[in-house]
C-alpha cells in the first residue's frame, strides 16, 4: 500500500542545492522545457517541491516524539488515542508539516480493511459481534485465541457504543494524508494479530484465562468523550486493557511490550537514507536522510523510545510456542464446555419449542382427533 512510486531514472542534468527550509541536498533541474521533462527531471522537480514544503523546524503537536536514526533520518512518532478527534487532527498536522517519505501505522494486514471503510460502516461493524465473526476468529486463530480476540473486540465495541465513534480514525487520516505527499510510502507496522493472540494465550495458565475472560465479559463502565481526551497521554483502550491485564504480567509482555519492540523495528526499517535518481550509472550515488511519521497508540510511545537505540531480535517474538500439557487440557475442557452448553441449549430450545407448538389450539385439536380415531 505504497503511495506514489518513484519513477525509473533517465538522463538529466542535476545539481545539489540547499533551499532555505530543507536540511538535505535537493536535486534542482537546471534547464529544459517543462513540457518535455524526462522522468528523472519530473522526479527531481516534485522532490524539490516536497522538500521546500518540508519545514526545518516544524510546529508539531505535543503528542509527537522525535527520534533520530544513526544515519540522520528522522522519525516523528505521533502518540494517539484510538477514539479521539484531536488525535486525527494531530496526525494530519504532523504529516503536512514534515512531508514524510514513509508513514508507518499501528496496523497489520488483518486489520487493513478499516482504512477503506467509511465511518458509518465501521461503526456498525464495531458494534456487531456476530456468530459469524466468532467462527472466523476461531478459524483464523484457533479456539482459545479466537475467543480471546472476540472478548477484546467486545472491549472495543463497548467503547464504540458508549462514544458513538468508530475506532482507527487516526489511521484513516494518515492514509489519506500520505496519499497527498509526493513519493510517500505507507507501511503497516504492527505484528500480525494471530501471532499476538497465540503468544498471549500461551503465556496464561487455565485459571488466568478464566479470570481474564470473566473481567472482559462483564465490562460495563460508562465512558464519555471527555474521558477519552483526558486520557490523551495514555490511550483509553490501552489504559482499560492495562487495568484488566495488570495482574497478568506475561499478558502485558505479549500484548504491549513485545509489540513495542516490533513497532520500533518497523520504524527503524522505514527510516533509511533515500537514494536519489542518477542521470547515468557513471554518476556517483547521492543519498539523503529520510523522514518518517509513525502513528501509534500513546501507550506504545515510551516502549518505542526505550527500544530505539537497542539491538532488536524480532524472530523470538514472532514464534508461537507449542501448547503445554495444561494448555491442551484447558483447550479440551473449553471445547467440552462449549459443545456441552451448545447441546444443552439445543435440547432446551427443542423442548420449549415442542411445548409451545403442542399448546396451540390447532395442535390440541389435531391431538384430540387422533385420540378419538384410535378409540373408534
Curated annotation (Swiss-Prot):
Electron transport listed as a keyword? no
**Superkingdom of this protein's organism:** Eukaryota
Task: Kindly indicate where the leader peptide sits in this chain.
Answer: none
**Which region ranges are annotated with the description Disordered?**
1-34
As stated in the Swiss-Prot or TrEMBL entry, residues carrying the post-translational modification Phosphothreonine are 65
MF term (GO), any: mitochondrion-mitochondrion outer membrane tether activity
Per the record, where are the segments of Low complexity compositional bias?
14-27
**One BP annotation, GO:** mitochondrial fusion
Gene Ontology cellular component?
mitochondrial outer membrane; mitochondrion
Give the UniProt keywords, A-Z: Acetylation, Phosphoprotein
Task: Give all N-acetylmethionine modified positions.
Answer: 1
Its name, as the record gives it, is: TraB domain-containing protein
